[in-house]
Amino acid sequence: MNGAKLCIQGVEKFFLHAGTRVEILKKTTVLFQQGMSYAIMGASGVGKSTLMHILSGLELPSAGSVLFNGHTISELAADEKFVFLNQSIGLVFQQPYLIRELSVLENVMVPGLLSGQSSAECKDRAQELLVQVDLASKRTSKVSTLSGGQQQRVALARALFNRPQFLLADEPTGSLDFNTGKLIVELLCKFQQEYGMGIIVSTHDMHVASAMNQIYYLEDGYLVLQPA
């Protein structure tokens, strides 16, 4: 299959707690392909968020490597790491982590401005995305005035600004009611088709997982693919 590839290769993650080794991931190897969508399921506290942080390069594994198109993320130069985090992947978390003092439009523009794009270009792209997530009428509102579901849609628009090859979403519906969560899932699927990107979603919700092409279960440190 053509397209970008994100791979965890022999990845382990453990912590020392009171002198005891606590294993989160045990020698895990999985290849994720652009154009496919994946769910990572597991109970709360099993290590899904840790795995997502490792995949995104925000956290280092205890052993093994994370590779993007064959390049080890931890070995990227600072400028290459910035491009990876700001352009190659998009990140959405359970909490939106928006800049509360800024407007909806200004929040969505941030990745473009960080990439050196002009203010006019960023404004046009942000407005286009806000139409797609049905928040164009809120573009001048402070994000602090929005509901949780609306804030998550702003976070999704921001994550998609630079048309990433992969979108990583860590429990994106975890703090939302069913109907709002369903809308977020529909948007994820819509954008996955439109952009042809890979999507990796961590969740404990089967409704979310069932919308993805493949489902993995994280249990006892192992990532196991559910049979089709």
Outline where the language-model segments fall.
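Short coil-to-helix segment of the ABC ATPase nucleotide-binding domain corresponding to the Q-loop/switch region
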Residues: 102-111
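Catalytic Walker B motif of ABC-type/P-loop ATPase nucleotide-binding domains
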Residues: 167-170
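Helix-to-loop junction immediately C-terminal to a conserved catalytic motif
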Residues: 56
